Amino acid sequence: MKTITRTQTGVRLESRLLKVLKALATELDMSLGDLLEGVVLHAFEGKAPFGPPTLAKIEQLKAVYGLTLTAGDAHQMEERP
């Protein structure tokens, strides 16, 4: 196990996306920070962060929280005033 230093940060995320991420972290019994670190580290290496069972759970959570955004929407969103 590697020893690291974490920094507290404030980030703004789309509301429904955050709800799905928090629920997924709870489902996987990890913190939101751990989940985000894992997703980013996998993305940096061009690897998929989730297998089929977790992807199925994500689809369920997206339906529960009304998340319809996709990767195609990334960097194309405009925040309401």
Residue spans for each PLM region:
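Short Lys/Arg-rich basic patches
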Residues: M1-S15, K22-A25, K62-G72, Q76-P81
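Extended hydrophobic secondary-structure segments
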Residues: L13-L18, G33-L36
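Short interaction-prone segments
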Residues: P49-L69
